[in-house]
Amino acid sequence: MTRPTMTGTLPADPQRRHWLRAGLTTAAVAALAPVAGSAAAAAPSAAADTAIDVLRLDLNESSYGPSPKVGPAVQRALVEAPRYVSAAQLQALQVQIATLEGVAPEQVIVGEVLEALGQHLALSEGAGGFIYSVPGYGALVDAARPFGGRAVEVPLNARLENDLPALLATIAPDTRALFVVNPHNPSGTLSPGADFDRFVSAAQARTLVIVDEAYLDYREDAAALSAVRLLRQGQNVVVFRTLGKIHALAGLQVGYALAPTGLAGALRQRGVGGAHAQNQLSLAAAAAALADTVHVAQVRRSVALERQRWQQVLTGLGLRSTEAAGNFVFVDTGRPHAAVAAGLLQQGVRIARVFAPYDTWVRITIGTPAENRRAQQALGHVLA
């Protein structure tokens, strides 16, 4: 597969993850009804965007739905909706996550972590640099800006991967953190395990390393690749996870971070991740989703199969693409993004925004087989 070579200083990704702070309506709870046992048989997540039925393949949401255990769990949690989340309830989820990840419960922070972490570092450490790859997801960096944080942008390498040597070389005495998304978004590329381990180990000796692993669950070998292994060794590393991707809880915006004990404690002293910042329904959904490893495995297999089919279609169209590891493809159409996106929208398919300077590349979320066929046909029509 032909690989592109591009350089340049690129803008940050303005998208954000925000945590659910209010209760859900009965209609919203009904939307969490159990899905079919097989992920492939689950209902698609198309939405009426305009007058036509538009496929939302723009935000890397899961079309396969949450675990069938989530709906009943949320229904049961409605009984507790009049009550604030207690410390004991939050601790139960922290213990569940800690057991799953092999860390201590006090290292688990549930709630708005990336943005709050960026703000905390800027406020507590003083003005300084926050290094990250561009184009990319820059929520943490953007959150630090109003408090003296300075974005230090490092372009992707020729294979559209995080440029590990360049990121490492950019660390300076005033660097407050190095933020890396692996697999990367929007390219989907995965930094190799051994190389990434060496990179993190070297970087964390000089600054805090924050690894966003939002898409790592789509890999069968996620546990062997996760930077959590380095955190367990006592390294200066924070790992962020969201349940908005493979667990299909984007509408609840549930996630957590795993951090060194000292940093986790400092964040809690600032009120980050406390019981008051949670809600009954999100906690119930998270606990149920994390417990259903069978559903996660089904979704992983389904997405992997559909990713292969997408690559076959793209090859057939004569297009080059990255070896994306998440639930999306990143492909060079050879045409302006705006024209392709507008053409696809006319065909009822919404894709992600442009990621400059890759102005001819498009990111398309992998949906259900039916959704993907529709998107592939639309892409072929637009490029004909």
Task: Describe each region flagged by the PLM.
Residues 156, 303-304, 313-347:
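Conserved PLP-binding catalytic core of the aspartate aminotransferase-like
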Residues 99, 164-173, 189-209, 213-246:
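Active-site pre-lysine segment of PLP-dependent enzymes
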Residues 123-180:
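PLP-dependent aminotransferase-like
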Residues 38-115, 120:
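N-terminal small-domain helix-loop-helix segment of the aminotransferase-like
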Residues 67, 236-316, 320-322:
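PLP-dependent aminotransferase class I/II
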